[in-house]
């Protein structure tokens, strides 16, 4: 999971062992001789170095006695099936500009050398500060002349970027270059790749949340070895056994879970609510937070937090990971990499003392392991070389590189069926069989504009419940009226009065207990213009004249921290603060 706007992400936390999707252990292998101006290196010689021997860390290879055999299916590994001679004939000498987090710039440059040698394309990196990646990307998109051709980002932002038309349709390139989309699990292909029926992304970091147990503790409580499907079949049983574990003492709490403010708490709620059959919206986009499924999840969270490690209300991924790998909890609700990393002695104190189980059930619910977070790879609609950008992203997400990321336990997860089915890789990734089985039934939050902001606001309220400020019911009720599209929440006009349903692509509002817009409404067909106002302040104007209507104008300040004014005809003006909640 990559979260550019927060202080801690799984990839950021492990930056020393990941090179923007490529393992740091590959650094020496990537230093191939620079290609001469008269020609490029031999293709096969470059591909031969993208191997287990050269990419997977030496200490891990020795620990697990790994052979040089591939951890992927070569017949489905895009870099080994694409026609690189054709790529060179069409793209050699061209340039692709790639937006990366500023802290990843050096590792990204190293990791992309093989692509440059295979394709003849020069990659220019456009560093963006990690804590302002979203705002910077949006402002560049709106300018109509983004400084980058491609970017990888947190997949919950996909709706924000795709809805207004900021991302290129990749379908033509995927067909031409035979990208193996059918090898991705449906949950990743559909939720990290497609928006409105168009392919706008290639899945990159493919996540699923899971439940992990400490064997030495839970086997005492359960009276024998842990059966991954039967020992803890329900959340009621998970509550019981973690309560028992909590009584054992010894500096080990019953359970770890993420309940920090913002999306962390929301993701825990979505994880559990999905098992109760949660549907976030009905067919009319009415929020379903206070449905039976939503309320049941809050009840379970409130029960589990009584058994949780101290400080759970401040736990995001980093804190949760440290507690689990440090042996401070008997059970953990987190991502799949909590299982892979727990196997690595340099990262974990619980090697050989844990097991990842199938998702516990809820009476009357469904089996719906949650695909939460993750990241995707996209091309800007304004790209100067969209085809070259696509080829670069296809290289970064190819199955061999993703498989070796998993072997290196760097938190960048593969989403390919052929990779997760590989028995050699399963031998070094304990959760993988349960993980692979679970993906056939995965649940995912919709990739709609503003979803991430809504999840942030909801998480703030859930955190208040966990800390005892309000009840679980109040946490959901406080967001029930605002967890909905801006055009419905405003109450000022109906979309039918201004736009046809096929005409509008909008961002969502993010509100806590009051109405507050944090993103502009963006509509297909807007015209963008930029000039200074009377005070000399640069402003961006977006306007559109609709048949039989007055011109619809939005004025944006020079920064997203300013306000926008929407004039709808001669009578209505709406001030829209754009600062984050």
Where are these regions (language model features)?
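C-terminal lobe and pocket-closing loops
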Residues: 53-72, 336-350, 362-460
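Extracytoplasmic "Venus flytrap"/periplasmic binding protein-like
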Residues: 113-185, 220-226, 323, 330-331, ...
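Helix-loop-helix "hinge/cap" segment bordering the ligand-binding cleft or interdomain interface
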Residues: 117, 124-127, 174-175, 182, ...
């Amino acid at each position: 999971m990559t979260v550019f706007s927060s202080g801690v992400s799984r990839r950021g936390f492990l930056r020393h062992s990941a090179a923007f999707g490529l393992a740091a252990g590959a650094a020496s292998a990537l230093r191939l001789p620079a290609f001469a101006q008269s020609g490029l290196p031999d293709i096969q010689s470059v591909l031969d170095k993208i191997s287990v021997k050269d990419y997977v860390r030496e200490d891990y290879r020795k620990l697990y006695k790994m052979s040089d055999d591939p951890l992927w299916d070569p017949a489905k590994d895009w870099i080994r099936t694409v026609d690189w001679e054709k790529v060179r004939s069409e793209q050699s000498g061209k340039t692709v500009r790639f937006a990366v987090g500023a802290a990843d710039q050096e590792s990204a440059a190293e990791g992309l050398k093989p692509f440059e040698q295979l394709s003849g394309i020069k990659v220019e990196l456009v560093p963006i500060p990690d804590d302002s990646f979203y705002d910077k990307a949006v402002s560049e998109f709106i300018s109509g002349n983004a400084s980058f051709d491609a970017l990888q980002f947190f997949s919950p932002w996909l709706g924000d970027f795709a809805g207004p038309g900021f991302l290129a349709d990749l379908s033509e390139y995927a067909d031409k270059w035979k990208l193996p989309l059918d090898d991705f699990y449906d949950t990743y292909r559909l939720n990290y790749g497609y928006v409105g029926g168009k392919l706008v992304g290639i899945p990159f970091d493919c996540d699923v949340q899971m439940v992990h147990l400490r064997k030495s503790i839970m086997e005492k409580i359960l009276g024998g070895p842990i059966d991954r499907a039967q020992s803890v079949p329900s959340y009621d049983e998970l509550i019981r056994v973690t309560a028992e574990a909590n009584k054992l003492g010894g500096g080990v709490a019953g359970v770890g879970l993420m309940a920090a403010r913002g999306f962390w708490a929301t993701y825990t709620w979505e994880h559990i609510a999905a098992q109760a059959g949660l549907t976030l919206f009905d067919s009319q986009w009415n929020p379903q937070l206070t449905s039976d499924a939503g309320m049941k999840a809050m009840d379970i969270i409130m029960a589990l937090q009584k058994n949780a490690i101290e400080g759970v209300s401040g736990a995001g991924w980093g804190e949760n990971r440290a507690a689990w790998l440090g042996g401070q909890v008997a059970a953990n609700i987190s991502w799949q990499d909590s299982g892979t990393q727990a196997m690595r002695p340099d990262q974990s104190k619980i090697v050989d003392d844990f097991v990842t189980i199938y998702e516990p059930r809820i009476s009357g619910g469904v089996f719906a392991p949650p695909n939460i977070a993750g990241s995707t790879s996209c091309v800007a609609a304004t790209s100067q070389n969209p085809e070259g950008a696509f080829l670069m992203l296809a290289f970064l997400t190819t199955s061999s590189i993703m498989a070796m990321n998993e072997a290196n336990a760097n938190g960048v997860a593969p989403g390919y069926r052929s990779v997760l089915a590989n028995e050699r890789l399963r031998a070094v990734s304990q959760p993988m069989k349960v993980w692979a089985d679970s993906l056939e039934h995965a649940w995912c939050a919709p990739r709609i504009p503003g979803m991430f902001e809504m999840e942030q606001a909801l998480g703030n309220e859930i955190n208040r419940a966990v800390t005892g400020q309000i009840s679980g019911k109040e946490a959901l009720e406080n967001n029930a009226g605002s967890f909905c599209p801006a055009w419905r929440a405003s109450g000022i006009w109906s979309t039918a009065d201004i736009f046809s349903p096929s005409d509008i692509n909008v961002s969502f509002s993010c509100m806590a207990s009051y109405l507050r817009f944090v993103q502009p409404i963006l509509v297909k067909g807007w015209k963008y213009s930029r000039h200074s106002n009377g005070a000399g302040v640069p402003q961006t104007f977006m306007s559109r004249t609709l048949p039989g209507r007055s011109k619809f104008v939005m004025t944006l300040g020079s920064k997203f921290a300013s306000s926008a004014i929407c004039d709808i005809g001669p009578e209505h003006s709406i001030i829209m603060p754009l600062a984050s909640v």
